[in-house]
A protein has these predicted regions:
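Glycine-rich phosphate-binding active-site loops on the catalytic face of alpha/beta enzymes
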Residues: 292-307
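Alpha-helix-loop-beta-strand connector modules within alpha/beta enzyme cores
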Residues: 105-126, 177-185, 254-269
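C-terminal helical cap(s) of enzyme catalytic domains, especially alpha/beta-barrels
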Residues: 303-325
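Alpha/beta enzyme core
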Residues: 76-89, 132, 136-201, 205-264, ...
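A mid-to-C-terminal "edge-of-domain" accessory segment
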Residues: 27-62, 322-380
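Hydrophobic faces of well-ordered beta-strands that scaffold small-molecule active sites
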Residues: 58-61, 94-96, 120-128, 148-152, ...
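N-terminal capping/small domains of soluble enzymes
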Residues: 22-132
Length: 380
C-alpha cells in the first residue's frame, strides 16, 4: 500500500497480477516511489543514554481503537466482559468509545455509568473530534460519571491539511482552539452542577506526519485555551497514526517535542504507536526514554491495519529490566481466551508472552539445553 495517511490504495489487484512478487515492476519501483522520512534536527539527543526506570501510565484503547478495527465488532455483552478483564489486569485509564459516533458507542458508556460498573479508581476516556455538535453529544453521554478524560483531536499532518481539510496550519489550529474553548465551557458548567473529575486530553492526529514545530504550536495553543496549570495537567497524546520512521526517529520526535513545549511540567506526554512498520513496541520503549509518560495501546496489539502497540509485550518486557509494570497478566491463558472469543481474532502462536508456542522448542539441541537448565535450577 502507498504511504499516505488514510488514503490507502487497494493492493488486491496488484497481488492478483503478481506485481508484488519478486521481480514484478511494482517491487522494482518501490525504492523510487517513496520519500525518505525526514530526520529531526537534534544533534545532542539525550534519550540514547537513558534507561527506563518506572512503568508508564497505561491506557487501554481496546474498546475504541481495537473494536473499530474488527471485522465483526464486539456487542455490548462482549464489551462489558472485556472492560471487566481490563479492570482485573489493573488498567486505570480505559478509552471506552466514541459516544458521539453511534448509538452502539453511546450505549456502552451509558451502561457502564448507569449500572455503576466503573470502579472509583478507574477513569474512563471518551474520544471526540474537535467539532461542536459532537462535543456537546459527548458531554451528554458522560452525565453521571465520576472520573472522565475528554479526549479530543483533529488532524494536523501536512498531507491531511492539504488533501482532506484544505486548510493552512492557522486554520487547523483554529479548529483545535474552538474545540478546547467549548470543552472548557461545558466542563465548567458540569462541575458547577455535579461532583465530577474531568481531565483533558488533546491529540494532534497524525503527529508522526506533522512538522514538529507545528505540533508544538498547536498543543501550546490548546493548553492556553484550557487554562492548563500544574494542578490541572493536560494529556498531550502524540499518535504515530501511521508508523513512518524507524523507532529512533520516533524517539527524536518525542524528545524534540518535549524540549520545545512551553510549560512541559504541566503536560503528561502520551504515546499512541501504531505498528505499520512492525516496530511499535520498540518505538514505544524509545519514546519513553525520550520523555513520554503514558502509553495508549491494546491487548496483543489489536488495531487498524497492522495494529496498535501491544500492551502485553510492552508491559512484560519491563520485568526483564527489574521493573514492575503495574499490570497483572498472571492469568494469561484466561486473558487470551477472552480476547479471542470477544474479538473473534486469534492470538498468533508466536506472539511474545501470550502465544501458545513461546515456551516451545523443537530443536533437539535446544531441548537438551533446556533440560540441563531445569536440572541446574533444581539442584543449585
Amino acid at each position: 500500500w502507498y504511504h499516505v495517511e488514510f488514503i490507502i490504495v487497494p493492493i488486491k489487484h496488484y497481488f492478483d497480477r503478481g506485481d508484488f512478487l519478486f521481480g514484478g515492476e511494482i517491487m522494482k519501483q518501490g525504492c523510487e516511489k517513496y520519500i525518505p522520512f525526514t530526520p529531526i534536527d537534534i544533534t545532542d539527543r539525550q534519550w540514547p543514554s537513558k534507561t527506563i526506570t518506572h512503568p508508564p501510565i497505561w491506557c487501554s484503547v481496546d474498546l475504541r481503537d481495537g473494536n473499530q478495527a474488527l471485522i465483526d465488532p464486539m456487542n455490548l455483552k462482549e464489551k462489558l466482559e472485556y472492560f471487566r478483564t481490563l479492570v482485573d489486569i489493573g488498567v486505570k485509564e480505559i478509552e471506552v468509545g466514541f459516544p458521539s459516533a453511534s448509538e452502539t458507542e453511546y450505549e456502552i458508556l451509558r451502561t457502564l455509568i448507569e449500572k455503576n460498573l466503573i470502579p472509583d479508581d478507574v477513569t474512563i476516556q471518551v474520544l471526540v473530534q474537535s467539532r461542536e455538535h459532537l462535543i456537546r453529544k459527548t458531554f451528554e453521554a458522560i452525565d453521571g460519571a465520576k472520573n472522565v478524560i475528554i479526549h479530543f483531536y483533529n488532524s494536523t499532518s501536512t498531507l491531511q491539511r492539504k488533501v482532506v481539510f484544505k486548510k493552512d496550519m492557522d486554520g487547523v489550529i483554529d479548529i483545535a482552539v474552538q474545540g478546547a474553548r467549548l470543552i472548557k465551557q461545558l466542563t465548567d458548567e458540569l462541575k458547577a452542577e455535579k461532583d465530577v473529575n474531568i481531565r483533558f486530553e488533546y491529540s494532534p492526529e497524525s503527529f508522526s506526519g506533522t512538522e514538529m514545530d507545528n505540533a508544538v504550536k498547536i498543543c501550546e495553543r490548546v493548553m492556553e485555551e484550557l487554562d492548563i496549570n500544574e494542578d490541572n495537567k493536560i494529556i498531550l497524546n502524540l499518535p504515530a497514526t501511521v508508523e513512518g520512521s524507524t523507532p529512533n526517529g520516533h524517539a527524536d520526535q518525542i524528545e524534540y517535542f518535549c524540549r520545545k513545549l512551553k510549560n512541559r511540567e504541566n503536560a503528561i506526554i502520551s504515546l499512541h504507536p501504531h505498528n505499520d512498520r512492525g516496530t511499535a513496541v520498540a518505538a514505544a520503549e524509545l519514546g519513553l526514554l525520550a520523555g513520554a509518560d503514558r502509553i495508549e495501546g491494546t491487548l496483543f496489539g489489536n488495531g487498524e491495519r497492522t495494529g496498535n502497540v501491544d500492551i502485553v509485550t510492552l508491559a512484560l518486557n519491563m520485568y526483564t529490566q527489574g521493573i514492575d509494570p503495574g499490570l497483572d497478566f498472571s492469568n494469561m491463558n484466561e486473558i487470551k481466551e477472552m480476547f479471542e472469543r470477544t474479538t473473534k481474532m486469534p492470538v498468533d502462536p508466536r506472539k511474545p508472552y501470550g502465544g501458545e508456542l513461546v515456551f516451545t522448542a523443537f530443536s533437539g539441541s535446544h531441548q537438551d539445553a533446556i533440560n540441563k537448565g531445569k536440572e541446574y535450577m533444581r539442584t543449585s
